[in-house]
Design a protein with these regions (language model features):
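A beta-strand edge to alpha-helix "cap/lid" segment located at domain peripheries
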Residues: 37-38, 53-113
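A short gly/proline-enriched turn/hairpin at secondary-structure junctions
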Residues: 34-45
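N-acyltransferase acceptor-side catalytic subdomain
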Residues: 49
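Alpha-helix initiation/capping motif
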Residues: 1-2, 45
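Short, flexible segments with low predicted structural confidence
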Residues: 23-30, 44, 70-71, 78
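Short acidic-aromatic low-complexity motifs
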Residues: 2-33
Length: 113
């Protein structure tokens, strides 16, 4: 099954992720103006590009986060990524990110679980 243009952009971002230029790469994915991200297990929440850059990508930079995309699934307005994550301290964890797209195919909400 083929992915929508936004899901393909998310996939490209995840496959090529590098904490040094994470936000720059992410900014190529279409988003709404006030898109929202919640990562409850990490205690992170942000709304809009500036907060996403400062809070979410600040965390990625501080931890030199590495991501490995193991699968991506699109189901209606949802894009789900299964990831293996690793921090600079060597901590490894599995994560699922769910992206909710609006009617125009832009990312509106992100849950990192």
């Amino acid at each position: 099954m083929s992915l929508s243009p936004t899901a393909e952009a998310i996939k490209h971002y995840k496959v090529t992720f590098n904490w040094k230029n994470g936000f720059e790469s992410w900014s190529k994915v279409p988003t709404t103006e006030n898109y929202h991200m919640l990562a409850p297990n990490l205690g992170l929440e942000a709304t809009g590009a500036d907060e996403i850059r400062d809070i979410i990508f600040g965390f990625c930079t501080e931890n030199e986060l590495q991501q490995e995309l193991t699968d991506i699934i699109e189901h209606g307005q949802y894009v789900t990524c299964m990831l293996n994550l690793k921090t600079k301290s060597g901590e490894s964890l599995q994560c699922v990110e769910v992206f909710l797209l609006d009617d125009e195919g832009r990312v509106d909400k992100i849950w990192a679980l």
